[in-house]
Amino acid sequence: MTTLNAKPDFSLFLQALSWEIDDQAGIEVRNDLLREVGRGMAGRFQPPLCNTIHQLQIELNALLAMINWGYVKLDLLAEEQAMRIVHEDLPQVGSAGEPAGTWLAPVLEGLYGRWITSQPGAFGDYVVTRDIDAEDLNSVPAQTIILYMRTRSAAT
């Protein structure tokens, strides 16, 4: 028997799974599920405690590099009581998602929410919202996802 050292490719499986989840559960349930998956992923590997946004950005990019999930830029928007999270190069699951190719975006909401609220001085009761209108998905070769993280009271 010949043993190959090739890594398995799960892209076909993930694409079929994405279609089935969307068809059977619907978009809202799918997004809730994927947010929970993101929170679970964040619990499996967490950044160290960071004292600055810049330091946190470096640590988050190191974690993202471990799983080849792109990179992030964090901006604290003091006047808006928010953090702008720009994630570049999100892996695609074919054309799945709304807009097409962004099926994994809700995972980022859970992932960043848990990572950021684990930091000193972070707010606990938060809302992560996606700014689809600001995402120019056709102008870049890789997916760009823009999220805003706000305290629940500032989001209403």
Swiss-Prot record:
Swiss-Prot/TrEMBL keywords = Cellulose biosynthesis
Q: Which cysteines are joined by disulfide bonds?
A: none
Could you tell me which pathway this protein works in? Glycan metabolism; bacterial cellulose biosynthesis
What this protein is called in its record is Cellulose synthase operon protein D
Instruction: Give the gene symbol.
Output: bcsD
What are the GO BP annotations of this UniProt entry? Answer: cellulose biosynthetic process
User: What Pfam families does its record include?
Assistant: Cellsynth_D
Source organism per UniProt: Komagataeibacter xylinus (Gluconacetobacter xylinus)
Biological role:
May have a major role in the perfection of crystallization, involved either in the pore structure itself or in the organization of the pores within the linear array of terminal synthesizing complexes (TCs).
The record's section on InterPro entries has:
BcsD_bac (IPR022798), Cellsynth_D_sf (IPR038470)
